[in-house]
Every structure is written in structure tokens, then in C-alpha cells.
Amino acid sequence: TPRSSSAASDVYKRQAEAPITFRSELDATDPNYGNGRGLWGGLIINGYAPIANDGGTANVEGLTGVPYGGTDPDDNSGVLRYVRVWNGGSSIAPDNEINGITLAGVGRGTTVEYCEVGLNLDDGFEMFGGTVDLKYCSVIAVGDDAFDTDAGYQGRGQFLLVVRADDSDKGHEMDSKTNGDLDSQPRSHPHFANVTVISSVAHGEDALRLREGTGGDFRNYIIHGANDGVRNDDNGSELVTQDLAAAQAHGQPNYLYI
């Protein structure tokens, strides 16, 4: 669980021809090696960017003594480039599994691009607050949601791919303050564009699930096979628009722009 300061150096950085791959220690001849979920944990990075939590800090579930959150939206936790995380999501408590890549309070000074999560038991990527941007990232056949945001996340995602298995959950699950004041600040305002969500035909889960106070800006989506493309409810005093210019919508976190 790296926790990086504003002077952080690279965390994991590789080239397209030789990506870093995290996966199970099982022998390659084991039948679970290729398709198993929950065979190990996952990658967790904690930073010092703002989060929507009383006191301004919190702990990732299952980790104590390593808080995340702070006051620096430009916090730099280094570089995550050409990284694959497969077969993770081991359970640390009943109904509590580890995400493939968790970015908790990570700031926009951090680089996350060309990363992939596959066959994770829980979510693919989850951002708890912070302002980190994602670019060229993919999630394949995870057991829960592909991209999950919470706790006042205000970053951006672009050129993202979701391929859902029959038992996968949502393409996106976007929250702001779980079990709390839906209008608390900072309010989640993910800005995602150029996203493809591919599902089996008549997949029972939403492609995008927006709830619990989130705002957001969502553009240029291709959605295939979901029963519901976008489901939006339980969002407090949210303002919904399609008329604001992009720069205006991104600068007003109380708006949902679709």
C-alpha cells in the first residue's frame, strides 16, 4: 500500500511491450490461474488530496494506521503506467473484498494511464475522493463494478473500456458521500468521456449508476447490452443539465451533465 508524498517518485512505470503484471502466485498449470478471481489482494495507493469525510481523512477498509486524504488537490503519488492487475480481490472480511486498483485521496499530480484490471472479485478501479485522472484504462470481467467513485472524487477519466461478464455488476457506480449528507463537500464530480461499456445481451445491471449525491459530466459513451444505460437517483439537491458548456459544467460540482 504505497502512501506517497508531494515529492513522490515513480511508483510503477513500464512500456507497452513489457507491462508490469500483478497476478496470482499459482502455478501456470493450475486450472484457476487464468480465470480465477480473488486469488490475491490488489493495488492500493493512498494520497493527500481532499475527500468528503469528517476530519478530512479516512482508512481504506481492511487497512488501519495508513490514512488517506488531505488538503492538496495537486498531490503527486507518482506514475502508474502500463500496469495490469489480474485475478485479485481476496476477501478480508465477509462481503469486503479488495479492489483491483484503489486510488484513495490521490491527487491530480499523479499519472494513471494504460492500466488494466481483469477478473477481480470486487471493483476494477475505485477512487475514494481525490482528483486523480485516468487515461487509457480498461476493466475486464470483474465481479463487481468496473469504475467506482466515492467520497468526493473530482477527477477525470478518458478513453476507458469496460467489458462485463454475465455476473459483473455495473459499468460505473458513482457516489459522493455514502450513508451521509448527500450535499456534503467536496461533492463527487467525475468527468468521464470517450467510454465504451460492453455487456452480454440484456445484462441486468446498469451501465452507469449515479447516486448518493454525485454530480458529474459524462460524454461520448458507447453502451451495449445493458438493460438501463443510465440510472440516476438519490442525489440530493442536484441540478441536471445538458445546456452548460463543458468548462462550466466541470467547474460546478452540484451539476450532473449527461
Q: What does each of the following model-derived ranges do?
A:
Residues 1-8, 12:
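Single conserved hydrophobic/aromatic residue that forms the stacking wall/gate
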Residues 13-18, 77:
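A short, structured loop/turn motif at beta-sheet edges
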Residues 6, 21-122, 126-258:
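Extracellular beta-rich repeat passengers
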Residues 11-13, 30-31:
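Short active-site-adjacent helix-start/loop capping segments
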